C-alpha cells in the first residue's frame, strides 16, 4: 500500500517571484506528499547544481521546465513501484540515475523535490508527523530561532557588507515565547529605524534593509531595539551574524566596500574578533571565504572556544567537505540546507557526522523560499537545537515559525525548547 504509483512535478514561483520545482508523490492507497524546493541568492561554489533552463525569453533564463521534465520523465519512470518508506534506496537510486558528483544532469532541484515529497508521503502513510517519521521517538527538541532582522550583502540594496544580523531569544522557555520576543524586537526596530528617517523596506528574508553606514551601526540599532523592547542583550537575547564572506573575498582580500576596508585574512579575523569583544555575538556564519581554509583555521583558533563558527558556503551540507573541515579544525558548526546536497538521506548523514565530531548544526532556509515548512520538521527531527528561517515578516518565513508552534503543541509536555542550552562556555 505504500508503493509509489505516481510522481508529478510542476513549475511554481518562490518568494522572489522566480520559478522553482514542486513535486507530488502519490502512493497506492491515495496518500500524497508534496514538497517545494528552495533556492539561494548567495550560493556556495560546491553546492549541488540547481538546474535552470537558461532561456532568456522565459523568466529571464530562470525557468525550471527541464528539471520538471526530469522528474516527470526519467525519475518517475525509475521510481514508480518503489516503496515510499525505503527513503535511502530511493535517494541512492536517484543519485545513481543522475550519474554526476553534483546532481548536475537531472538537477538537485528535481532530485530534492522527489526526496522530500517521498518522505512526506511515507510519513502520512504511517500516520506520523514528518518530524516523528524522520527523527523517531526521541525527536522533541524545539530549536532556538536565528531571526534575521537587518539584511545587507546579497539580500539587500544597501552598503552593509555583512549579509544578516540576527537575534536569538535564548531566555524563552518555548518556541511560542521565542517567536513573541522576536516579533516584539522586530517591531521595535521598525519604529527605531523610522524615527531615524531610515527605510523600513524589507529584504529577501523579511529583515529590514536600511541605508546604514557600517556593521557597527547595524549592531547598535539591534541592541537599542532589544533594550527598548524590554529585553537584556547578552542575557535574554544573543546576536548572530551571517557574513557571507565569500561574496566579498576577492584576490585574497576581504573587500568591505561599504566601509572602505580591504582586509587580509588575518585582518578579517581581527575585525570579527573586535566585534565579538564589543557585542554579545554568539554565532558567526561564513566569517571567511569558502576557499580560504587557512583563514578559517585562524578564525577557529581565535574564536572557536567562545563563538559558534558556522560553515555554510564552506561545507555546503556535503559530508565530504564537512569531513575536511573537521580534520583541519576549521569551524565548529554546520549550516544545514537541504538543497545544497539534494537529498534527505545525505542531509541527515551530514548532520550525524557533525554531531559525532562535536559540531553543532543549524537547520536553514534559503533566501528564495515557499510556503513549504519541511525544515521546521527537520529541525525537530534532528534535535539540532537551532533554526535559521528569516524574519518576522513574509509568509514564506512565518510558515516555518507557525509550523514549529504547531509541533510544540503536538509534543505537549515532552517538548523541550533548546533555549540557553545552545550557549557555549
From Swiss-Prot:
UniProt-listed Enzyme Commission number(s) = 4.2.1.11
For this chain's UniProt record, which GO biological process terms are given? glycolytic process
PROSITE patterns tied to this protein: ENOLASE (PS00164)
Primary residence: cytoplasm
Cofactor(s) needed by this chain:
Mg(2+)
Any idea which positions bind Mg(2+)?
Answer: 242, 285, 312
Known catalytic reactions: (2R)-2-phosphoglycerate = phosphoenolpyruvate + H2O
Q: Which residues form the active site?
A: 205, 337
The cross-references to Pfam families, in alphabetical order and at most eight, read: Enolase_C, Enolase_N
Q: Which CDD domains match?
A: enolase (cd03313)
Protein's UniProt keywords contain NAD: no
Q: Does this UniProt record's set of keywords contain Metal-binding? A: yes
Q: Tell me how the cofactor is bound.
A: Binds a second Mg(2+) ion via substrate during catalysis.
- Pathway(s) per entry: Carbohydrate degradation; glycolysis; pyruvate from D-glyceraldehyde 3-phosphate: step 4/5
Chain residues that bind (2R)-2-phosphoglycerate: 163, 337, 366-367, 388
**Top EC class, one word:** lyase
Q: Which Gene3D superfamilies match?
A: Enolase-like C-terminal domain (3.20.20.120), Enolase-like, N-terminal domain (3.30.390.10)
Q: What is this protein's function per UniProt?
A: Catalyzes the reversible conversion of 2-phosphoglycerate (2-PG) into phosphoenolpyruvate (PEP). It is essential for the degradation of carbohydrates via glycolysis.
Assigned protein family: Belongs to the enolase family.
UniProt protein name? Enolase
Query: Source organism lineage?
Result: Bacteria, Pseudomonadati, Pseudomonadota, Alphaproteobacteria, Rhodobacterales
Name of the gene encoding the protein in the UniProt record: eno
Amino acid at each position: 500500500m505504500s508503493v509509489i504509483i505516481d510522481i508529478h512535478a510542476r513549475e511554481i514561483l518562490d518568494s522572489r517571484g522566480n520559478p522553482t520545482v514542486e513535486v507530488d508523490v502519490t502512493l497506492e492507497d491515495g496518500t500524497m506528499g508534496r514538497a517545494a524546493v528552495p533556492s539561494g541568492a548567495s550560493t556556495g561554489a560546491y553546492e549541488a547544481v540547481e538546474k535552470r533552463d537558461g532561456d532568456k525569453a522565459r523568466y529571464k533564463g530562470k525557468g525550471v521546465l527541464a528539471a520538471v521534465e526530469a522528474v516527470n520523465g526519467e525519475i518517475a519512470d525509475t521510481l514508480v513501484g518503489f516503496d515510499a518508506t525505503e527513503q535511502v534506496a530511493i535517494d541512492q537510486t536517484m543519485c545513481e540515475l543522475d550519474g554526476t558528483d553534483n546532481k548536475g544532469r537531472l538537477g538537485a532541484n528535481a532530485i530534492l523535490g522527489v526526496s522530500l515529497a517521498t518522505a512526506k508521503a511515507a510519513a502520512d502513510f504511517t500516520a506520523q508527523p514528518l518530524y516523528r517519521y524522520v527523527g523517531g521517538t526521541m525527536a522533541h527538541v524545539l530549536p532556538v530561532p536565528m531571526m534575521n532582522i537587518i539584511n545587507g550583502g546579497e539580500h539587500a540594496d544597501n552598503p552593509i557588507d555583512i549579509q544578516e544580523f540576527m537575534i536569538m531569544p535564548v531566555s524563552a522557555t518555548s518556541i511560542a515565547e521565542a517567536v513573541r520576543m522576536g516579533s516584539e524586537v522586530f517591531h521595535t526596530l521598525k519604529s527605531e529605524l523610522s524615527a531615524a528617517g531610515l527605510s523600513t523596506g524589507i529584504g529577501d528574508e523579511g529583515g529590514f534593509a536600511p541605508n546604514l553606514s557600517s556593521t557597527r551601526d547595524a549592531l547598535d540599532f539591534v541592541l537599542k531595539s532589544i533594550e527598548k523592547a524590554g529585553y537584556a542583550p547578552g542575557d535574554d537575547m544573543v546576536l548572530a551574524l551571517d557574513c557571507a564572506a565569500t561574496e566579498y573575498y576577492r584576490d585574497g582580500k576581504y573587500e568591505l566596500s561599504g566601509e572602505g576596508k580591504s582586509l587580509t585574512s588575518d585582518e578579517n579575523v581581527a575585525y570579527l574578533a573586535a566585534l565579538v569583544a564589543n557585542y554579545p555575538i554568539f554565532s558567526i556564519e561564513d566569517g571567511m571565504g569558502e576557499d580560504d581554509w587557512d583563514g578559517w583555521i585562524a578564525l577557529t583558533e581565535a574564536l572557536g572556544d567562545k563563538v559558534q563558527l558556522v560553515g555554510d558556503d564552506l561545507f555546503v551540507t556535503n559530508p565530504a567537505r564537512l569531513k575536511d573541515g573537521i580534520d583541519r579544525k576549521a569551524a565548529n558548526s554546520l549550516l544545514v540546507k537541504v538543497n545544497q546536497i539534494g537529498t534527505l538521506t545525505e542531509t541527515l548523514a551530514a548532520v550525524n557526522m557533525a554531531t559525532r565530531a562535536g559540531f553543532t548544526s543549524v537547520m536553514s532556509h534559503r533566501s528564495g523560499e515557499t510556503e513549504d515548512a519541511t525544515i521546521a520538521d527537520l529541525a525537530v527531527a534532528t534535535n539540532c537545537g537551532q533554526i535559521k528561517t528569516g524574519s518576522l515578516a513574509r509568509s514564506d518565513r512565518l510558515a516555518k515559525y507557525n509550523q514549529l508552534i504547531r509541533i510544540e503543541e503536538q509534543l505537549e509536555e515532552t517538548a523541550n525548547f533548546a533555549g540557553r542550552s545552545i550557549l557555549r562556555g
